[in-house]
Amino acid sequence: MRRARRPLGPPFVRVLLLAVALGLGLWPLAADAGPWLRRPGNTYLQLSYSRIAAARIFSPDFSVQPLGASYEQHALGAYAEVGLIERWLTASFEGQLFRYNLLVDQGATYGLGDLRLGFWTGLVEKPVRLAAAVLLGIPSGDSSPSAGPGADAEGTLIARTLPTGDGEPDVELRLSLGHSFGRARRWPLEHYLVAEAGYWFRTRGRSRDLAGNLSFTDFSDAFTYRAELGTKLPFRFLDRFWFILRMTGVESFASSIDASRTCATGLGNGVTFNAYGFEVAARIWKGLGLSIGLDSAFRARCVAAGVNLKTGVSLEF
């Protein structure tokens, strides 16, 4: 962790509220296998960069409050999926290969973020697509970053509010419904529609207090959802682009009291958000693609009140 060059001052108390945004933040633009599973051997790879900057946070009562400092998160992410068994099994992987958290002029932490493995199976193929998934969260990030040898209590406290992971293994069960339509004489536009719902089983998060002792937090389960509409225009060159509107959300079952505790610990229990997003995905050449998108929460608690920018390059083969 890089230490500050100036004293924290009174606003630091409010900066502690940033912790949940650091532990989880606003989820990046959604990526998953969805209802269209891959054929055996068919592979999709994506490398992405995302950035969020904020000077405000959604507090435990859903109001927007100032942080008292500027926060930035930069992340290098990876997503992959590969078909294993026709219709019945597609595997996915996603995670942050490198995550950099910064409180401007105060300190920063960096390292590997949390990872997630997914296993998807097809349930229905016609007239709509329906798939089910099991998603396994791996706590590979650091839930208790160190300020380094010889750091004082204040430096250690800053480091603890800038985790790269939540220290908690978890499991999510998800259903994904999809349908593609259009490209007809009376309606030449091409569309796809996806609706997903999941139940997120949370477990116990592990971290360390300022004295270095192990501490544990029981996470409350959550309901997750995603709705997405993609549109492609029937014009030369423009038919290489998908224009995507998206709504995503997490509704934690934690009480506001529980959420207020974790807003000051960075472990992420109680995180709730409803966010809208827009993305443009382009096919450049054969299986090579590029994408850029934005998303932002309009209702949330314990999440940074800022816009998340994500760009990515993908390869399908």
Q: Model-found features: residue ranges?
A:
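Residues on the lipid-exposed face of transmembrane beta-strands in outer-membrane beta-barrel proteins
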Residues: 47, 78-82, 117-121, 134, ...
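Outer-membrane beta-barrel biogenesis signature
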Residues: 25-58
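Short loop/turn motifs that connect adjacent beta-strands in outer-membrane beta-barrel proteins
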Residues: 32-41, 85-89, 124-131, 182-191, ...
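Transmembrane beta-strands of outer-membrane beta-barrel pores
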Residues: 49-55, 84-88, 95-101, 136-142, ...
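Surface-exposed strand-loop-strand hairpins of Gram-negative outer-membrane beta-barrel proteins
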Residues: 52-75, 105, 161
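Outer membrane beta-barrel transmembrane domains
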Residues: 54-60, 64-67, 208, 213-317
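Outer-membrane pore/translocation modules
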Residues: 99-222, 264-268
